[in-house]
Amino acid sequence: MKTESEVGHHMASSTLNVDAFRDYLETQLKRLPPLPDVEQISPRVIRVLGQNPGEFTLQGTNTYIVGTGRSRLIIDTGQGSPQWIENVVFLLESMGIILSHVLLTHWHGDHTGGVADLIKSYPHLTTAIYKNSPARDQNNIIDGQSFSVEGATVRALHTPGHAHDHMCFVLVEENAMFTGDNILGHGTTAVEELGPIMSSWRRMLTENCERGYPGHGQLIHNLNHKITEQLASKVRRENLVLDALRCIRGQQGPQMAGRRMSINPKQLVILVHGKGINENVSTLVLEPFLIETLRKLAADGIVGFEICNGEKRWFPVQTV
């Protein structure tokens, strides 16, 4: 997968359109390395693929069975694929494993969709489902909470941004981290709120974990490097937006004295990416990226917005 900055450069081509972007995603999916349905990827971790491959789930959701003894825990449950629960049941029965805890990284359906099938197959798990901001009949996970089974202890980190309830889990014995959807094995993740996820990435860095077990994609061997890359990409985009806003302020002539110059996201796309962008690509792809950045900068007090004729327009504050 290309980096976010490379994708942004690719999307700036005047020949790009929505179909081409979809084709790009499909091509990138085909280039992903295949992952086995079930694989022992460390002495303490077995990965079971969720059987839900797609443009945004990559090879499928990774679910992890953690521990070395008879009693183990599972992190995430896939999307509810019948093949996933069949693979999980076969694995547990063949290895004599009993699940003690079901830990969910966040609420999205491709991570929680298999909960009902797990409970149907193993009714004792009805009271063993754990998630931050839990649904009814689930148990809460709080920041710093630990879960232990034979051979493994995982410690929860509240890391919002991809989702408000997102949790990562540090596997203490391996100095590794289950990163959920905050960091993927390929490419970059979708963001609910940019400011919180950047703070979460910085917090994840302080754990100094060597290995990452992501919610989607292959094993991450240098986790801090991957996190640092993601942070740098977002900071670069912030700088592009700020440079563009400085540009419009610099163009303010004497006739605009005392009046504020502001622009809408569509105009900002042109300033950042140039003219000739397909309108659908601008609306569906580029504008949401820039709005995400603008909201973060507004929360930081660096930019502001005003409503003009029902339209939100953005401007730099004087400290920019």
UniProtKB/Swiss-Prot annotation:
The active site is at 110 (proton donor/acceptor). Keywords: Hydrolase, Metal-binding, Zinc. PANTHER family: ATROCHRYSONE CARBOXYL ACP THIOESTERASE, ENDORIBONUCLEASE LACTB2. The keyword Metal-binding applies. Lactamase-like protein; part of the gene cluster that mediates the biosynthesis of dibenzodioxocinones such as pestalotiollide B, a novel class of inhibitors against cholesterol ester transfer protein (CEPT). The biosynthesis initiates from condensation of acetate and malonate units catalyzed by the non-reducing PKS pks8/GME11356. Pks8/GME11356 lacks a thioesterase (TE) domain, which is important to the cyclizing of the third ring of atrochrysone carboxylic acid, and the esterase GME11355 might play the role of TE and catalyzes the cyclization reaction of the C ring. SMART domains: Lactamase_B (SM00849). One of its GO terms (molecular function) is metal ion binding. Binds 2 Zn(2+) ions per subunit. Its EC number is 3.1.2.-. Its cofactor is Zn(2+). CDD domains: LACTB2-like_MBL-fold (cd07722). Zn(2+) 1 binds at residues 106, 108. It comes from the Eukaryota. GO terms for biological process: secondary metabolite biosynthetic process. Induction: The expression of the dibenzodioxocinones biosynthesis cluster is positively regulated by the transcription factor dibT. Pathway: Secondary metabolite biosynthesis. Belongs to the metallo-beta-lactamase superfamily. This is Lactamase-like protein GME11357. It comes from Pestalotiopsis microspora. Zn(2+) 2 binds at residues 110-111.
